[in-house]
C-alpha cells in the first residue's frame, strides 16, 4: 500500500496521458509510416525524455510513500517479466530486454538497501543529479565488449537490442534524485481527486494495457480506410 497524494497522482496521470499520446504517434510514424516531421526530430525527442524523466522522478519520490517496498518491487518484477515475455513472442522486433519497468523494479530493489543507510539526502540529491549528467551518454552507443550480460547497467555490444531501454546508468541517478527529494521536499499542497489523479492511481495497469489497445485501434482505423 502507498499513502496517496492527489497532487502526485495528478502529475503521474499527466505523465500517463502524455505517454499514451506519444506511443500512439510512435506507432503511426514507425509502424504505419505516417509522416509527422516534428515527432521524428528534436521536439519529439524532448517530449519523450520529459515523459520518461517525469515517471522516474515521481517513482523515486513515491518510494518514500510506500508502506511495503518488497511487495511493490515484486509487483514491478512481475509486470516487467510479462512485458518481456509478451514482446518476445508476439512482437519480437520490439522485444523489451530492460525497459523502464525493469529499471523501476531494480531501482526500487536497490533503494531498499540505500534507504537503510544514514545519508545526507540533500547532498546525495545533488551528487545524483551530477552523476546523471556525467553518465547520460554512457549507454547511448554500443561498446567493444563480448557480452551483453551487463546491458542492464548500460554496457552492451552492437548485437544488443531492446524495444524499450532504460539501463541503470544514467537513469538510476534520476530515480535517486526523486527519492532524495521525497525526504526533504514534503509536498503538502494537495488537490481534489480528478480524472488525472484517478489515472495516476492506475498508472501501472494503464502502462501494461495501453499499447495493445492502441495497436488494435490503429489497425481498426486502418482497416476502415482512415489511415
Q: For each predicted feature, which ranges?
A:
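Alpha-helical transmembrane segments and their immediate juxtamembrane cytosolic regions
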Residues: 1-227
Amino acid at each position: 500500500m502507498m499513502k496517496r497524494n492527489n497532487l502526485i497522482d495528478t502529475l503521474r496521470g499527466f505523465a500517463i496521458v502524455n505517454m499514451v499520446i506519444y506511443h500512439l504517434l510512435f506507432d503511426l510514424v514507425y509502424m504505419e509510416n505516417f509522416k509527422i516531421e516534428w515527432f521524428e526530430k528534436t521536439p519529439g525527442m524532448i517530449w519523450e525524455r520529459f515523459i520518461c524523466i517525469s515517471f522516474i522522478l515521481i517513482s523515486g519520490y513515491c518510494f518514500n510513500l510506500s508502506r511495503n517496498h518488497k511487495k511493490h518491487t515484486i509487483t514491478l518484477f512481475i509486470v516487467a517479466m510479462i512485458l518481456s515475455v509478451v514482446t518476445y513472442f508476439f512482437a519480437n522486433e520490439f522485444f523489451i530486454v530492460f525497459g523502464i519497468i525493469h529499471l523501476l523494479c531494480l531501482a526500487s530493489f536497490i533503494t531498499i538497501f540505500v534507504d537503510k543507510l544514514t545519508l545526507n539526502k540533500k547532498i546525495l540529491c545533488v551528487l545524483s543529479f551530477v552523476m546523471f549528467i556525467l553518465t547520460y551518454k554512457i549507454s547511448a552507443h554500443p561498446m567493444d565488449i563480448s557480452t551483453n550480460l551487463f546491458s542492464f547497467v548500460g554496457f552492451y555490444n552492437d548485437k544488443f537490442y531492446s524495444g524499450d531501454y532504460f539501463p541503470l546508468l544514467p537513469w538510476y541517478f534520476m530515480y535517486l534524485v526523486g527519492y532524495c527529494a521525497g525526504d526533504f521536499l514534503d509536498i503538502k499542497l494537495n488537490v481534489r481527486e480528478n480524472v488525472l489523479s484517478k489515472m495516476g492511481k492506475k498508472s501501472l495497469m494503464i502502462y501494461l494495457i495501453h499499447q495493445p489497445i492502441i495497436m488494435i485501434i490503429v489497425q481498426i482505423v486502418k482497416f476502415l480506410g482512415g489511415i
